[in-house]
Structures are given as C-alpha cells and as structure tokens.
C-alpha cells in the first residue's frame, strides 16, 4: 500500500506505475514468478498468493544452476567449516535484504525490483540497476549453455553405455557441437516469441530437477560408487582470504531478491510481518538444500571435485544420468525466460531513451526483438563455447548478485529513511547505519570477487605474459 506521508522522490513521474517494457520483467531466475499477476491499484484485484505459495515461489526463485557449484565453492573456501560459517554469516543480510525491498515496495507503491530502486533512489540508479539485471541475466544464460555442454556428452555416453574414453572419440559428443546444436534447434526458437507461455512447466521441472540432484548427491555420498575416490579433503583454509572464494557462489545461489518484489506484491496480505516468515522459511529451506549438496558433494570428491559436481560422477551411473537429463531440460527451458527478462529490460531502456512508453509500430518492434534476440543468442553462444566451466561465469556474475542482495537494498533503505519527516530516533539511526553496512559489504564482495575472477583468468591464460 502506498504511504503518501513519506516522500521518496520529488518527481511525480517516479511514483506512478510504469508502463516501460523493461519494467514488465516480472521474473529473473524463476519461471514461476512470471506467472504471478502484476498487482493492480485495486485491493480486490491484488494477487492472491498465500504465504505457503509465496514460500514455494521464493525457494524456486533461489534454487538453480548455482547448486552444481556449491561443492567446489566449499573446496575453494577451505573446507566445510569455512563454507557453512560463511553461509550462516551472510544469511542474516540475505533475509533482511528481502524484507527491506518489501518495505521500500510499500513506501514507493512500486511492484518490481527495478521500479523500487528507480522510485526510491532516483532515475540514475534505476538505470544502473536495469543494466545490472541485463548483465546478470546475460551471464546466467552463458552459464546455462555451459551446463548443457558439460552434461550432454556424458548423458549420451550413458545412453550408449560407453566409457569416458569411448565418449571422447565421437564427433557428436564434442562439447562445442552439442552446445551449438541444442542452442540453435531448441533454445533459439523458444527465445524469439514476444511472450513466454511455458513458465509453469519450466517451474515444475526446475523444482523436481533441483531436489533430485540434491538427493542424488547425498545418496551417492552415503553409498559411494566403487569408481569414486575422494581427493584430499581440506579441513581449514590455507589462508583466511580463501574463504572469500565461496562468496560468488553463495550470492549467486541465494539471489532471489529481484524476483521477490513481485512475489511480495502478489500475496493476499502484502505486509511486512508475514513476509518476514515467508523469506525466513524460504532461506532456511535453501540453506539445507545448498548445504546438503555442498557438504556431501565436497566430501565425496574432496579437492578433486569439479566446478559442476555432476561432472565428477562416472558417465555410466544411471541415477546421475537422470539428474543430468533433468538439469539439461531445466536450463533449456530456463534460458528463454532469462533472455526474455534481459531483453525486456533493454527494450525499456531503449524506449525511455527515445522518450516513448510503448512501441506502437508492431513491425518495427518485431524487427528489433528478433535482432536483439539474435545478438544476445550469438554472443552467449560464442562465449559459452570458449569458457571452460560454470565456475568462471559464477565468479563474475556472483559479484552482481551481491549488488542485488546488499548494495541496492542498502541504498533503498538509506534513501527511504532519509526521506522521512518523522523525528529521527535511535531506531532511525540504527536503520541508516545498517543500510550503510549493507552497501559497504556488498561493494566489498563485488569488488573482491570481480577483481579475483579477472586476476585468475589472467594468470590461468597460457598466452598471458
């Protein structure tokens, strides 16, 4: 509900519901969020999601491809203790960030993440936020294509009942071929349409696939295969700075903040108190899933664990092959949805630059949409063909995820409190201080992870001096 007694921006245009195409991207990671109807100004037509339904949607929005990288993140952090401790320390900020966004959504009467940032923090930060969302979705699309290349050759080997050495002899199991063929024949046709109508199916597959992978990793740790032997299992980080290596994966895994704003507004009672319960339960569920996968996957393979944990299992394992099939289906159906969100944001920025609200020329919109899709698709495909594993991508976009979790919510909280005309009490000072802490932590994570990722790419490049 709008709070007219609290001024956020003096510009009247920042308060109304935006019709920008870029601000109609109701979903970032999870297909299910897009199925939530945008809220109307009438209370009677404001969504009807129950608290239990909201928990399901938030969990679905958080769980995703980052799950496969958690065992490797625990290894990079220096062991289970360091990885779990880091997760627990970040959990408080992750949950409060979700609550802050809901509070600012109420104050500004806006219904999507980028709209809230734009209304509360101003147009400049709104544009930066939209660009960050576009880059984030672009990077996630690259990660999806890499996962296809990682899993499809081993899935083919399982179907043909062939060993690892035999798989590599076939031209049709070459990683670049499988990524290109799958992308051109399936993903590209699904990405071109203006609207996406298969979200609910992708949502169901995503949930089933994620939980199945977690169960398989845990079961395979309890009853390991004879062909699997773990490497060295570190019990502590070699250096205290190694702990920060897990931050991109944790941020990428728990980032559901962009999707959370429309979920909050879709609830039967979009109020802060029930929302606290929703996000707390959701993040606890995610914590158990990620920790279970990370701990069991790490203990199964130790320091030899792959960036994609499923790559560490033998290709002839039927149960793991089913997990690979689930993951491939999930990413194939999720790529078009992520692309839709990124394309919608870019379209909104373009229309705003032109000073228009909507594109009235249907033919012009169609040509631009096809061009945007082809450029996006070709760039993500080319990069996926030459990036060796998802760890490289997550290490970069994990820093952006930290901005969505820490920086933008912190800035929104600071600006919202500074705009209040009430007496500035101790609680007011504490809230502003907390916002400053969130921005500082987020900026540190973004800077540290991005710099570290670039540095590692440089030193691992054989052509570097």
From Swiss-Prot:
Task: Name the major location.
Answer: membrane
Instruction: Report keywords, A-Z.
Output: Amino-acid transport, Cell projection, Ion transport, Lysosome, Membrane, Sodium, Sodium transport, Transmembrane, Transmembrane helix, Transport
Q: Matching Pfam families, A to Z?
A: Aa_trans
Q: Which InterPro entries match?
A: AA_transpt_TM
Q: Transmembrane stretches, by residue range?
A: 54-74, 82-102, 128-148, 177-197, 204-224, 244-264, 275-295, 318-338, 370-390, 394-414, 427-447
* GO function terms (MF aspect): L-asparagine transmembrane transporter activity; L-asparagine:sodium symporter activity; L-glutamine transmembrane transporter activity; L-glutamine:sodium symporter activity
Q: Which GO terms describe its cellular component?
A: axon; lysosomal membrane; membrane
Source superkingdom = Eukaryota
- A GO BP term, please? amino acid transmembrane transport
Subcellular localization(s) per the UniProt record? Lysosome membrane; Cell projection, Axon
Tell me what topology the record assigns in the membrane.
Multi-pass membrane protein
Q: Which reaction does it catalyse?
A: L-asparagine(in) + Na(+)(in) = L-asparagine(out) + Na(+)(out); L-glutamine(in) + Na(+)(in) = L-glutamine(out) + Na(+)(out)
Q: What does this protein do?
A: Symporter that selectively cotransports sodium ions and amino acids, such as L-glutamine and L-asparagine from the lysosome into the cytoplasm and may participates in mTORC1 activation. The transport activity requires an acidic lysosomal lumen.
Q: Give the family per the record.
A: Belongs to the amino acid/polyamine transporter 2 family.
**PANTHER family associated with the record:** AMINO ACID TRANSPORTER, SODIUM-COUPLED NEUTRAL AMINO ACID TRANSPORTER 7
Record's protein name: Sodium-coupled neutral amino acid transporter 7
Q: Which organism is it from?
A: Danio rerio
């Amino acid at each position: 509900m709008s709070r007219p007694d609290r001024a956020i921006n003096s510009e009247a245009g920042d308060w109304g519901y935006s019709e920008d195409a870029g601000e109609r991207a109701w979903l970032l990671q999870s297909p299910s969020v897009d199925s939530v109807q945008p809220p109307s100004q009438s209370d009677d037509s404001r969504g009807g999601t129950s608290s239990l339904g909201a928990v399901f949607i938030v969990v679905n929005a958080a769980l995703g491809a980052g799950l496969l990288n958690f065992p490797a993140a625990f290894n990079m952090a220096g062991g289970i203790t360091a990885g779990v401790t880091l997760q627990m320390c970040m959990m408080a900020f992750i949950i409060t960030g979700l609550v802050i966004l809901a509070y600012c959504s109420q104050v500004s009467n806006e219904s999507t993440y980028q709209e809230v940032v734009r209304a509360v923090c101003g147009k400049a930060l709104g544009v930066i936020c939209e660009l960050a969302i576009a880059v984030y979705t672009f990077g996630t699309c690259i990660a999806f294509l890499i996962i296809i290349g990682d899993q499809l050759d081993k899935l083919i080997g399982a179907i043909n009942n062939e060993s690892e050495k035999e798989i590599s002899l076939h031209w049709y199991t070459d990683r670049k071929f499988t990524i290109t063929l799958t992308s051109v024949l399936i993903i590209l046709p699904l990405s071109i349409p203006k609207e996406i109508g298969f979200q609910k199916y992708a949502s169901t597959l995503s949930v089933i696939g994620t939980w199945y992978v977690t169960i398989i990793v845990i079961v395979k740790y309890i009853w390991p295969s004879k062909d699997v032997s773990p490497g060295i299992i570190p019990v502590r980080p070699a250096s205290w700075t190694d702990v920060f290596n897990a931050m991109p994966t944790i941020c990428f895994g728990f980032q559901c903040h962009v999707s959370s704003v429309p979920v909050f507004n879709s609830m039967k009672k979009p109020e802060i108190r029930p929302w606290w319960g929703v996000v707390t339960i959701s993040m606890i569920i995610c914590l158990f899933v990620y920790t279970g996968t990370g701990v069991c996957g790490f203990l199964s393979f130790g320091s030899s664990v792959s960036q994609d944990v499923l790559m560490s299992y033998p290709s002839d394992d039927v149960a793991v092959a089913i997990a690979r099939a689930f993951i491939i289906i999930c990413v194939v159906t999720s790529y078009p949805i992520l692309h839709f969100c990124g394309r919608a944001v870019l379209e909104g920025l373009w229309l705003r630059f032109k000073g228009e609200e909507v594109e009235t020329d249907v033919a012009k919109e169609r040509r631009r949409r096809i061009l945007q899709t082809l450029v996006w698709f070709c760039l993500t495909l080319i990069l996926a063909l030459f990036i060796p594993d998802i760890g490289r991508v997550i290490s970069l976009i994990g820093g952006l995820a930290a901005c969505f979790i820490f920086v933008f919510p912190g800035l929104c909280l600071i600006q919202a409190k500074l705009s209040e005309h009430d007496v500035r009490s101790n609680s007011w000072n504490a809230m502003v201080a907390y916002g400053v802490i969130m921005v500082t932590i987020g900026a540190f994570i973004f800077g540290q992870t991005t710099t570290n990722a670039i540095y590692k790419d440089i030193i691992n490049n054989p052509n570097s001096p």
